[in-house]
């Protein structure tokens, strides 16, 4: 919690049993109040690993709803738990949880209502296991979108986001 604002990290999971523990253990619980994991009908033991880590809010989809459906479940549960700040963190460790402090304080201090982080800077995506073809495709799409929209973002399609409940 920062300035009496409840912070919830949501983990949209699919076959994340091998990387979930590493991701979870780096979440800064000095400010994070709760964690929600939504298992999108994984074929591995993602839910069991989440349970063994002590994650209190585990939702398992009976059928795979895809990334968008998983996100909706994550955000709806966080709002149901009265989150003031919701941070989406993928449990595949392509995003470092170490940015949660900065993202949270940026919103808690009222600077922005939305913070979008990048896994591309510093080659974090490749170090985190992103396949090279996906990395190249992501870079190409981002370059194209930057040119079309006259922007300078490092990654348009990031899944590492923080939102104020206002948005």
Model-derived features: where do they sit?
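Conserved sequence signature across two-component system core domains
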Residues: 13, 38-40, 61
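Cell-envelope/extracellular polymer assembly enzymes that use nucleotide-activated donors
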Residues: 6-8
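A short, conserved beta-strand element in the Rossmann-like catalytic core
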Residues: 41, 66, 94
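Short beta-strand-to-loop acidic/aromatic patch adjacent to the donor-nucleotide binding site
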Residues: 83-94
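Acceptor/aglycone-binding surface of glycosyltransferases and processive sugar-polymer synthases
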Residues: 61-63, 67-80, 97-167
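Donor nucleotide-sugar binding loop of glycosyltransferases
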Residues: 16-19, 42, 96
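Short, well-formed alpha-helical segments that are part of the catalytic scaffolds
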Residues: 14-29
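A conserved acidic beta->alpha catalytic loop
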Residues: 39-47
């Amino acid at each position: 919690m920062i300035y009496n604002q409840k912070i919830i990290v949501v983990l949209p999971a699919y076959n994340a049993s091998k990387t979930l523990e590493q991701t979870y253990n780096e979440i800064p619980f000095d400010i994070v109040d709760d964690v929600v994991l939504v298992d999108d009908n994984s074929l591995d033991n993602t839910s069991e690993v989440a349970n063994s880590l002590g994650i209190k809010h585990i939702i398992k989809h009976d059928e795979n709803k895809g990334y968008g459906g998983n996100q909706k479940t994550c955000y709806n549960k966080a709002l149901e738990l009265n989150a003031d700040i919701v941070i989406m963190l993928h449990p595949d460790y392509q995003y470092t949880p170490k940015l949660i402090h900065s993202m949270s304080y940026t919103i808690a201090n009222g600077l922005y209502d939305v913070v979008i982080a990048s896994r591309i800077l510093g080659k974090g995506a490749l170090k985190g296991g992103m396949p090279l073809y996906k990395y190249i495709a992501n870079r190409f799409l981002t370059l194209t979108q930057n040119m079309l929209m006259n922007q300078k973002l490092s990654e348009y399609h990031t899944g590492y986001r923080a939102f104020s409940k206002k948005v």
